[in-house]
A protein has these predicted regions:
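Acidic, glycine/proline-rich low-complexity segments that act as flexible tails and inter-domain linkers
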Residues: 1-70, 110
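A short alpha-helix capping/helix-coil boundary motif
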Residues: 6, 21-22, 55-60, 83-84, ...
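Short, small-residue-enriched loops and turns at beta-alpha junctions
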Residues: 12, 29-33, 67-71, 96-97, ...
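Buried hydrophobic packing segments
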Residues: 29, 42, 78-85, 103-106
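Glycine-rich anion-binding loops and their surrounding alpha/beta cores
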Residues: 51, 74, 86, 109-225
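Glycine/serine-rich anion-binding loops at beta->alpha junctions
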Residues: 59-99
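Active-site-proximal loop->helix
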Residues: 96-111
Length: 225
């Protein structure tokens, strides 16, 4: 499956697929899903088609919220706290996928979120943390092309969500990752059982990629902040 994923992702990055073909790919993922081994292969294919960052010191920490909860601004609080503790957290975020605004859109209200991989590393090593749009650099470049199809469809396939998050973290050099999974009516993960399954998948995928993952299942039935 790894070789097939390489060809699929290479076609996406090189823009060899029409919007109709790419839509069919995303819908197929939504309907059929993938097991963890297939998701790990997809994730590594996404990493290898873009740039990667290596830091001179570690460990490298990161944080991600699955999203789907209105008003979620947790990242804007977590990153400064981690950086203030003397740790490195090179945080990249996406624009909106299934909501009105993604983390990168929110940060952009206050500051420029565009930086390349070299600048991300430089800033993270200098001040400890970054708040950047992942689409402005070539970390897992297939992801942003796929997101452009997911947004109008209003879907975020389980396997693609896992691969999207973990490919960006792997490419950014993360060793330790915390995943926030907002749960409840109106979120991407409506039940505690689904949240627990999501957490297991993230941790299993992290183990295959060499990233230590811890998950927090949080209440998401009301706006955050």
């Amino acid at each position: 499956y790894y070789v097939r994923s390489q060809f699929n992702i290479a076609d996406i990055v090189q823009h060899n697929l029409s919007n109709i073909e790419l839509t069919a790919y995303v819908v197929a993922l939504e309907i059929n899903g993938m097991n963890i081994r297939e998701t790990a292969d997809l994730t590594m294919a996404m990493v290898e088609t873009g740039d990667t960052i290596t830091f001179d010191r570690g460990p490298i920490f990161d944080f991600h919220s699955v999203g789907g909860c209105p008003g979620n601004k947790i990242t804007l609080i977590v990153v400064p706290i981690v950086a203030a503790a003397g740790l490195i957290i090179p945080k990249t975020s996406s624009r909106a996928i299934s909501s009105a605004a993604g983390t990168a859109d929110i940060i952009e209200v206050f500051a420029d979120v565009n930086m390349d991989a070299h600048k991300l590393r430089t800033v993270a090593e200098k001040v400890g943390g970054t708040l950047a749009w992942g689409g402005s650099m070539s970390l897992s470049p297939a992801d942003d092309t796929i997101i452009k199809v997911e947004y109008p469809l209003g879907i975020d396939p389980h396997a693609q969500l896992l691969a999207s998050v973990m490919s960006k973290k792997k490419a950014a050099g993360a060793n330790c990752l915390v995943i926030d999974i907002p749960t409840g009516a109106g979120t991407k993960v409506p039940t505690i059982e689904e949240a627990q399954a999501f957490a297991r998948d993230f941790m299993d995928l992290g183990e295959k990629l060499g990233i230590e993952v811890r998950c927090a299942i949080t209440y998401g039935e009301q706006p955050v902040g």
